[in-house]
Amino acid sequence: MAATKREPLRPISSNAGTVERRARGGAAAAAAAKEKEKENEVPTEIGRGKDGGEKKPPVVVAVVVPPAPPLKPSSLQVRMKAEEEKEREEEEEGSSPAVALVAGLQVRMGPRGRELLLPPPPPPPPLPLPTSSSYEAWDLSDNEAAPASSWATLPNRALLCRPLPLDVGRCTCIIAKETLAAAAAGARGVALYSLYTNEGQGRQDRKLAVARHRRRRGRSEFVVAQNLDGIFCTSDKNFLGTLSSNLVGSRYRIWGQGNRVDEIKSQSKRLLGVVAFAPTVTTLTGSFRSMRAWIPKNQSIHLKNSNSAQIQHISGLPKDWQEKKIKADQLCSRSPFYNNMTKRYELDFRERAGRMGYKVQPSVKNFQMTLEEKGRQTILQLGRIGKSKYIMDFRYPLTGYQALCICLASIDSKLCCTL
């Protein structure tokens, strides 16, 4: 019996089985990868295999994924859709929302029971155009004329020599210095002041009077007439009178024309007014002017629409008018107020600020006069609106000539006033 050859024994190790298994697993993975590469290889000859037979192309299987089932709408969406369809049907049928009474008011109810706003009311019909002259002058366009003033029908002589009727109210005039016009008329070097009516927008202003200023022996003198002919010839029918002052300019006297026949016989004139200026009033905050005027009282009151004759002045102020003040009307200047913004004294012209489009400028020559001390109604006022241009408002019992002379006395330069 033959002896069997034995292999030498290997040392037993705990990692021997693990190493062997890893080796076998690696070989199997390599073989599988190699087979996969062979499957993915593109054959160089289509239709021929290794054995020479025809090779079929690979079959491509299209996998169709079924669409996802639609989502089921929620109960809220179903209800909203039903309400929209219901509203659409109501609109097609022409049904209008219901109207309910809530707290005594009509409220339109929608299809869902909601309150709807009522439609706005229709616009009111346009107002008819006014047929009278009661509307204001500033409501007119540039091409329309302002309504005629209540004194527009009075002639020039009546405005100058007769008191303004009570029912006329206030008369507005413009005083302008016209040196160039005087030079053109042959009176070179003589200052002329012209008085114009302010008829309003779109109307022709009337020239009422002209005043010539000159100095005689240091005193101011104004010769007033309706035109230039009366200025240079006092016997002309257009001559109205003169305004003269004392040496320092503290007192002015208004002389009227009077009856020309009586003047030739007695060589006397009628005193139609006196204007007195007090020395400049000086206070801790500044200074301002103060003035007074006296005019004859009228015999009666005249109305524009009455059939009675025009009233006339009495024979002027009597010689003892200062002792008999009852025969004269006294006009007092209104005290100005101190403006903290401009730091000076000013008068309140807001009453006439929007009328006729003129803006009164601050000036020491501006004034407002009333019939009583601290009276409320303004009888005469003067306001500066430009260089050597003033606006004048006067009312009963003044005449246009008296109002012009009082304003010229304030415009004239004087020694008694430091302003």
Curated annotation (Swiss-Prot):
- Give each disulfide bond as a residue pair: none
Mark out the compositionally biased spans (Basic and acidic residues): 33-57
Q: Where is this region: Disordered?
A: 1-96
Similarity field: Belongs to the TUB family.
Record protein name field: Tubby-like protein 4
**Which species?**
Oryza sativa subsp. japonica (Rice)
